[in-house]
Amino acid sequence: MHYFIRHELLKHATLSALRLFSMIHPGDRILVHLSGGKSSMALLHCLHAYQEILQRENPDPGGKGVFDMGAVVVALAYENYDLLPLVNYLKALGVTHYYEKQDMNHYCSHSLDLCSSLKQKVIYNVARRYGYTVLALAQNLDEMAASFLSSVFNNGSIQTMEANVELKDLNLRLIRPLAFCREKTIAEFVKTAGLPVMKTACPICEQSRVEQVRLKEILAAEENNNPHLFSSIISAISPLLHLSSQSDIVLESDTTSQTKVITWTKPEN
């Protein structure tokens, strides 16, 4: 039995988001980006367990109503940065997986934008090459809330990351099944389940998360005064999570002083 089934908070939050935003359809082929962080490991197990739920609800030998799932691990080549343990873990789970290594030595400069762009291109190429129709990313409610605050504080706008959005010209949908999951709930689940977690080895990416950490500290301080803060935040941002059904942008986590808007573009053939 998956730990997901026995963790009621995580189960309820994930199923609520999956069903409210109609994230998964019969016959979908879903590609999970597995970074090795807590959220991506939790996402992998949540979707793996959700497959079993659908199989019980739809005991059709033909498999109708059940989706296919694979995972992609993107390793940017830094010294002492080895994500191969994730591959071994995926093998043990029996999850279809793809290990893609990107050499960084050809680039004269290094930035967060470069890391994001390279990963996105690799992930898209894997999805296209193997026929996946949905990309699953692991941003959680705390990150959604921080993104919302950043857009208000820094850009004078009201926006956050969308939960289920079609990517124009890519024949893909992007979903965020952990949109209603608290970071602390995910951390508790990962610890209880004993899931392997790997920290990024990219120093620039780590430094660029300072702004997001600051915003999360603001939220934590306010939550001490208002225990229902995140329930209110869910009500406030839910309309933004499915504001548009068509988009050619992806709002990624706030890792700089401004909300990052990353454009997904087709890589050259």
What does each of the following model-derived ranges do?
Residues 1-150, 154, 184-192, 267:
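ATP-dependent adenylation/nucleotidyltransferase module used to activate substrates
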Residues 4, 8, 117, 180, ...:
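Electropositive phosphate-/nucleotide-binding environments in soluble metabolic enzymes
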Residues 63-69, 142-221:
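Catalytic subdomain that performs nucleotidyl-dependent activation
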Residues 78, 104-106, 165, 181, ...:
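Residue-level detector of flexible, active-site-proximal loop/helix-junction positions
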Residues 98-110, 172, 243-259:
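Mobile, glycine- and charge-enriched loop segments
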Residues 117-131, 164-169, 218-237:
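Short, basic, helix/turn surface patches
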Residues 195-269:
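The feature marks non-catalytic terminal segments
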